[in-house]
Amino acid sequence: MSWCDGSDDNYDLNLERVSNTDHPSVQLKDQSQSCVTSRPDSKISAETPITTCPSCGHKLHHHQDDQVGSIKDLPSLPAGVKFDPSDKEILMHLEAKVSSDKRKLHPLIDEFIPTLEGENGICYTHPEKLPGVSKDGQVRHFFHRPSKAYTTGTRKRRKVSTDEEGHETRWHKTGKTRPVLSQSGETGFKKILVLYTNYGRQKKPEKTNWVMHQYHLGSSEDEKDGEPVLSKVFYQTQPRQCGSMEPKPKNLVNLNRFSYENIQAGFGYEHGGKSEETTQVIRELVVREGDGSCSFLSFTCDASKGKESFMKNQ
């Protein structure tokens, strides 16, 4: 997640305030101050500071009772700053989310890792419809709670609701569930899921480029029903590269300092007034020494006689 990603002119964070003095129960302490003496209804505030990103125009709402160290106390966030936590750091944020001590939760965490509930959850909504998610390859993080696919059993819901009749889309787990050790020493687990479409009866499943990494705490490889988990969702724009794609020369097999080369040579001769032709296959074992020199062990096979001779060249 990046902040101020498209502007080079102004990196200052602008503070706006929305006043609501029409409500009789709201009182202002001072016009020059931003605090409120009474706020009986938490949904109604006389003065709500809003932080605006000068690049994208995104607005962050916060109240007077926000914890110290909120974004209104930050002078600016430079262009290119991204939210890209490691596996251990993800478990650290998840520990703070489930902890009863809310002081462990970073005051800005909801801006970077929003919480999805109910029908807006990951396993109910196509990733394209999730907030802030697009096919640009950037990663988005979410808190959510997995639910059971059926009332009985432990199988988790992976099916995504779609508007098209007869069309089925679901997340499919791939690979092994791997343990992750958090900074506090508590163990969690990570599993990778890939989105498949038309994954139903008598339909060929088609793999998409949507990928999800799901993290949960505990000592069990499977998360519990309703347990808070943290998932990061992204669209894989480039396929993974496995090894070098450099072409290997034909008829050459390298085994450390040894290589075999097959050389075919044709020879013509006359026998009884008739021209005949035979083909010899010369097999050479190339021994590459440490000083850069090479020795050649040649095996010459006469195809017409089926004989093979040996010759060593230095």
From Swiss-Prot:
UniProt entry keywords in alphabetical sequence: Activator, DNA-binding, Nucleus, Transcription, Transcription regulation
A GO cellular component annotation in the UniProt record: nucleus
Superkingdom of origin organism: Eukaryota
Predominant location category: nucleus
Subcellular location: Nucleus
Compositionally biased residues, Polar residues: 18-39
Naturally occurring in which organism (per UniProt): Arabidopsis thaliana
Tagged with keyword Nucleus: yes
NAC domain boundaries: 77-236
Pfam families: NAM
Name of the protein this chain belongs to: NAC domain-containing protein 10
Description of its domains: The NAC domain includes a DNA binding domain and a dimerization domain.
Any one GO MF annotation of this record: DNA-binding transcription factor activity
DNA-binding region, residue range(s): 187-242
GO BP terms in the entry: positive regulation of DNA-templated transcription; regulation of secondary cell wall biogenesis
Region (Disordered): 18-48, 150-182
Keyword Transcription: yes
Biological role stated in the UniProt entry: Transcriptional activator that plays a regulatory role in the development of secondary cell wall fibers. Is a direct target of SND1.
Residue ranges with Basic and acidic residues bias: 160-171
Tissue-specificity statement: Expressed in protoxylem and elongating interfascicular fiber cells of elongating internodes, developing metaxylem cells and interfascicular fibers of non-elongating internodes and developing secondary xylem of roots.
